[in-house]
Swiss-Prot record:
Residues at which prenylated FMN binds: V168, R170, Q187, H188, E229, H386
Positions of K(+) binding: W166, A218, A219, M221, E229
Gene Ontology CC terms: cytoplasm; cytosol
Function: Catalyzes the prenyl-FMN-dependent decarboxylation of pyrrole-2-carboxylate (P2C). Can also catalyze the carboxylation of pyrrole in the presence of elevated concentrations of CO(2) or bicarbonate. Can accept a modest range of heteroaromatic compounds such as 3-methylpyrrole-2-carboxylate, indole-3-carboxylate and furan-2-carboxylate, and shows very low activity with thiophene-2-carboxylate. Attenuates the virulence of P.aeruginosa in a Drosophila model when overexpressed.
Protein name: Pyrrole-2-carboxylic acid decarboxylase
Coiled-coil intervals, chain numbering: none
Family: Belongs to the UbiD family. UbiD-like/FDC subfamily.
Domain description: Consists of three domains: an N-terminal alpha/beta domain, a split beta-barrel with a similar fold of a family of flavin reductases and a C-terminal alpha/beta domain with a topology characteristic for the UbiD protein family.
Cofactor note: Binds 1 prenylated FMN per subunit.
Species of the source: Pseudomonas aeruginosa (strain ATCC 15692 / DSM 22644 / CIP 104116 / JCM 14847 / LMG 12228 / 1C / PRS 101 / PAO1)
Subunit structure and binding partners: Homodimer.
Secretion signal, residue range per the UniProt entry: none
EC number: 4.1.1.93
């Protein structure tokens, strides 16, 4: 296994060796400048920036932007994401999804518990804790505050100790030892917090920032309730994640993490959190009261690196990490339910607001169904799952379409979906509350925003196709295509 999957420092060094990292030694300001540079990196698909010289910050502290952004080189577009799993830099979406699904079927490998780890090189306890000494960035001009946690994961455990949950979440700085952030009731952190609330106790909590990249990715995967991400990460990389115990509350966190915050989630205290530029690409103008997270201890490596995601228009990590992990989980859900689905992909360009399902048309024909009945079956299966709850729209295409290629998806959507017959709304299915097009009535009702779009011609339900596709792949004999590819440079096109 490539060590980059289990060691964030190794991951950063690997990016540098690949030419996919820029060491920024020019002084920068955590107040918007770091956010602006990182947003431009996403939008230009430039190398990840590692900021070494941050004004008025803890000496030696650094910030890494765009840790899973896409690259401009099409052949290596997903290399930063692939490196999270120790895969080669030319790996694509299908390679990554295949690896994630294989780990779902593998035996979990429990973490290895250590007495000490690199994250304990520096430990602040009690009154020593001062989060404001770190380069906590204001990422967007509209944000309601500075965000410490945008590319880290919460660590919580059920009161009976049976389930350790790692889940990606955001946290806004309130003061030197307090943060605020959402604990959505339907997500795992909310489920576990409610168990502690019923006991009348605050929730023991930690956050890992700059954790093993594979662990961060797994924490963004909607695994089933009760499944501990640490064991899944072990199965994913083929060896245990090394963990150490926190200083104050008995939780276990990855031993080589850059920064660990620990303390508790308040029973009932809240603070206004947000607004914040979000995964869907918008920043709505009003914040919300969210639970307080009290930090009782802070551990960090020498010269710690704080990774950040500057959320907004795609693609950024909410799409490359979260969207990819959802894709793998939805494929598993669909196939376990017997649906004729051979690939699922949350198009990054759709900001994790739709998933495209590739349908095996021969298997579809064997079902003897039609568009309406099939859409209803897909909706019940997918939207009813934990992963499917997060994605409000599904697009069904034949497997002649490569669902990982957005131009093919858009072509199918424009030319195969009938405006009257192929749009199926499911207003009774509950919604994910952060979907941006939901209005006040939808949110009050908790439903109304679910849609399945059928991009399968009626003939495809019988295993046929209405018309031939006029493309290089479909409109020419195989032997001729190969000859053209082999002679491409002879024609004067170089290696393009």
């Amino acid at each position: 296994m490539n060590r980059s999957a289990l060691d964030f420092r190794h991951f950063v060094d690997h990016l540098r060796r690949q030419g996919d990292l820029v060491d920024v030694h020019t002084e920068v300001d955590a107040n918007l400048e770091i956010g602006a540079i990182t947003r431009r990196v996403y939008e230009r698909r430039a190398p990840a920036p590692l900021f070494h010289n941050i004004r008025d910050s803890l000496p030696g502290a650094r910030v890494l932007g765009a840790p899973a952004g896409l690259r401009a080189d099409r052949a290596r577009a997903h290399s930063r994401l692939a490196l999270h799993f120790g895969l080669p830099e030319h790996s694509g979406p299908r390679d990554i999804v295949a690896m994630l699904r294989a780990a779902m079927r593998a035996e979990p490998i429990a973490p290895r518990r250590l007495e000490r780890g690199p994250v304990q090189e520096n430990v602040w306890l009690g009154e020593q804790v001062d989060l404001t000494r770190f380069p906590v960035p204001l990422l967007h001009e509209q944000d309601g505050g500075r965000y410490f946690g945008t590319y880290g994961f919460h660590v919580v455990q059920t009161p009976d100790g049976s389930w350790d949950s790692w889940s990606v979440g955001r946290l806004m700085l309130v003061d030197r030892n307090t943060l605020a952030g959402p604990t959505i009731p339907t997500q795992h952190i909310g489920i576990i917090r409610e168990q502690w609330r019923r006991l009348g106790k605050p929730t023991p909590w930690a956050m890992a920032l700059g954790a093993p990249p594979a662990a961060l990715a797994a924490a963004g995967m909607p695994l089933p309730e009760g499944v501990s991400e640490a064991g899944y990460v072990g199965a994913l990389v083929g060896e245990p994640v090394e963990v150490v115990r926190t200083q104050t509350n008995g939780l276990w966190v990855p031993a080589n993490t850059e920064i660990v915050l620990e303390g508790e989630i308040s029973l009932d205290e809240t603070a206004l959190e947000g607004p914040m530029g979000e995964y869907h690409g918008y920043s709505f103008p009003i914040g919300k009261p969210q639970p307080l997270f009290h930090v009782h201890a802070l551990s960090f490596r020498d010269q710690p690196i704080l990774p950040i995601c500057v959320a907004g228009t795609p693609p950024e990590e909410n799409h490359t990490i979260w969207g990819t992990m959802i894709s793998a989980q939805l494929l598993d859900v669909a196939q376990n339910a017997g649906l004729p689905v051979d690939m699922v992909w949350c198009s990054y360009e759709a900001a994790t607001c739709w998933a495209v399902l590739s349908i095996d048309v021969q298997r579809l024909a064997a079902l003897g169904t039609d568009a309406a009945a099939f859409a209803a079956r897909v909706a019940e299966t997918v939207f009813g799952s934990h992963a499917g709850h997060l994605v409000p729209k599904l697009i069904l295409v034949g497997n002649d379409i490569d669902v990982t290629e957005i131009d093919q998806v858009v072509w199918a959507l424009a030319t195969r979906a009938h405006p009257l017959h192929d749009h199926f709304a499911f207003p009774q299915i509950r919604d994910f509350p952060m979907v941006p097009y939901l209005d006040a009535e939808d949110k009050a009702r908790g439903s109304g925003g679910r849609l399945v779009i059928n991009c399968l011609y009626p003939e495809q339900f019988a295993g046929q196709m209405r018309a031939a596709t006029a493309s290089f792949r479909h409109a020419y004999p195989t032997a001729l295509r190969r000859r053209v590819e082999e002679r491409w440079s002879d024609y004067g096109f170089g290696d393009a």
